[in-house]
């Protein structure tokens, strides 16, 4: 008698998902692992993150799905804001709490000395990338050299620190710390900054907490945890995504009529009479189907604006 086989449950097919998940990444997760988990929960065909956030760090990790991936580079280039806790008096091999202790020094720091040290790092500064970073040297991430006990030459990189605000201090305790908010350009290493501030104070330091609170114009307001995404009903998870144009809110908005929309979607340049002073790029909205019952304006893409001419750059197909 043939053995009865129970059919395996069918997995839902991958589907077109378009939008941005403002993920509040938990500690201990790599950015790629968080992306893979979210992609699986949404059954999305296409996804990408907008720059790595260390496993040690928590906070805002925008994940782009579908057509939103066309604009992920804009967030890679965007300014960032972090909140971090620096433990003074101890220097480690990784500039964070996961490394080996390299040195311990007494801490004798006044609030005035702290402010003076911090002020030295506001503005354009040169940073040497840490060995424990994902930056590549000869095609290999620096952290792989570090794990093998090797140190390689790294060129200093110019970054901009827009502001450093002191949120809290605990300078007199047995484990002195300072909590900072840092607004900075892309490519800034907060671990290196914390270590350098410690050296400027004469006692050394390392990060014990790091949280990203802003990327470009995106903040933690409305951010979603992996737990919340997992707990949501499968057919309700898509509603947790922000629309594609959440990535484009800093660009001026241009609306086209049905004929202009059709030409734009065919990649044609459009001479227009528009008052757009100081704008060189715009987000474009228009009608995709003029004969549809609901012919409302939707995002068509991003265009260059120069000399009164709209030139399509990145088209969106929703």
Curated annotation (Swiss-Prot):
GO biological process terms, semicolon-separated: mRNA pseudouridine synthesis; tRNA pseudouridine synthesis
A matching Pfam family: TruB-C_2
Entry annotation: catalytic residues: 54 (nucleophile)
EC id: 5.4.99.25
Catalysed reactions, semicolon-separated: uridine(55) in tRNA = pseudouridine(55) in tRNA
Entry annotated with the keyword Thylakoid: no
Superkingdom, natural source: Bacteria
Functional note: Responsible for synthesis of pseudouridine from uracil-55 in the psi GC loop of transfer RNAs.
Keywords linked to the UniProt accession: Isomerase, tRNA processing
Record has Isomerase as a keyword: yes
Protein name: tRNA pseudouridine synthase B
Molecular function (Gene Ontology), one example: RNA binding
Family of this protein: Belongs to the pseudouridine synthase TruB family. Type 1 subfamily.
UniProt xrefs under NCBIfam families: TruB (TIGR00431)
Enzymatic class: isomerase
InterPro entries, per database record: PsdUridine_synth_cat_dom_sf (IPR020103), PsdUridine_synth_N (IPR002501), PUA-like_sf (IPR015947), tRNA_psdUridine_synth_TruB (IPR014780), tRNA_sdUridine_synth_fam1_C (IPR015240), TruB_C (IPR032819)
């Amino acid at each position: 008698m043939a053995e009865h086989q129970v059919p395996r449950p069918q997995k839902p097919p991958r589907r077109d998902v378009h939008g941005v998940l403002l993920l509040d990444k938990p500690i201990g997760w790599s950015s790629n692992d968080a992306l893979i988990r979210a992609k699986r929960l949404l059954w999305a065909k296409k996804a990408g993150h907008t720059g790595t956030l260390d496993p040690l760090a928590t906070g805002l990790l925008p994940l782009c799905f579908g057509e939103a991936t066309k604009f992920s580079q804009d967030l890679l280039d965007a300014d960032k804001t972090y909140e971090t806790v620096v433990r003074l008096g101890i220097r480690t091999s990784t500039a964070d709490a996961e490394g080996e202790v390299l040195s311990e020094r007494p801490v004798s720091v006044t609030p005035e000395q702290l402010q003076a040290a911090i002020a030295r790092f506001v503005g354009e500064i040169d940073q040497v990338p840490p060995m424990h970073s994902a930056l590549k040297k000869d095609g290999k991430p620096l952290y792989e050299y570090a794990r093998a006990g090797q140190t390689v030459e790294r060129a200093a990189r110019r970054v901009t620190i827009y502001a450093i605000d002191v949120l809290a201090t605990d300078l007199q305790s047995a484990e002195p710390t300072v909590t900072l908010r840092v607004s900075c350009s892309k490519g800034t290493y907060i671990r290196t900054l914390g270590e350098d501030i410690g050296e400027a104070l004469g006692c050394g330091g390392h990060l014990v907490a790091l949280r990203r609170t802003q990327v470009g114009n995106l903040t933690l307001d409305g951010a979603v945890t992996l737990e919340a995404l997992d707990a949501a009903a499968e057919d309700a998870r898509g509603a947790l995504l922000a629309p594609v144009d959440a990535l484009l809110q800093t660009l001026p908005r241009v609306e086209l009529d049905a004929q202009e929309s059709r030409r734009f979607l065919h990649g044609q340049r459009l001479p227009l009479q528009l008052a757009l002073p100081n704008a060189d790029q715009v987000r474009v909205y228009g009608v995709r189907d003029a004969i549809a019952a609901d012919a409302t304006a939707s995002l068509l893409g991003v265009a260059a604006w120069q000399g009164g001419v709209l030139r399509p750059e990145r088209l969106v197909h929703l």
